[in-house]
């Protein structure tokens, strides 16, 4: 479906911005009390730079609505599905923790909508807003480099890695995963993700997973036809790890029906939050 709407929603991965700012800059403290503020400063600089650059975009690419989406606690509903989900992650740095609230206040000071919801990840909120926009044929650009969000890319939804000034559309997703966005979930389910402690099928990487999905069409079809796969080792590992693959699919699939209470109603022209 062609994009017939004049609206263009930009969904900013706020948590991604925070950690990029934290690790990219040397420690910085407030002179008056020693409060760590390096991530706050870096986040604000990144957001301001992005807002300024977005003003110079062509009209078709210029955002009409903004929202910054945050994670909340480390644990969420995925830990109920698989208790080891992200269990390998290091604890949040102590000097970063007190900066979270100031970053949220900074977003408010920019008069941009900040959204978070307990028990869900930022990616799920982004997926939900993207789904709502798609139903209204509204163009969406997701400001993030997170590969887990690439399953959302389609004709009206794009990604932008502002740190690398890299545009991510359907072809860029295919270049990375070997499949188009609508099959990314299936590839991730087979390959797993060590950074999130998602098991996948042992010995199956992105390249092999893409070959299998391109051959059979879906994760379920791969598992149904596992016994017919010619390579003995690959055949056996698929037969032995069906449950892991199916659990992995539940983990990598972003929820598109999160009960968000805040509408996307931030005016780009006035940078002012308002209710619709």
Report residues per predicted region.
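Noncatalytic, basic helical substrate-engagement surface that gates or grips nucleic-acid strands
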Residues: 2-143, 147-169, 244-247, 253-268
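Short, solvent-exposed helix-loop connector elements
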Residues: 25-32, 191-200, 230-239, 261-268
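Conserved small/polar residues in nucleotide/adenosyl-binding loops
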Residues: 269-276
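Accessory alpha-helical DNA-binding modules that contact the DNA backbone or grooves
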Residues: 194-249
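Short, hydrophobic/amphipathic alpha-helical patches that form generic packing surfaces
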Residues: 186-196, 249-256
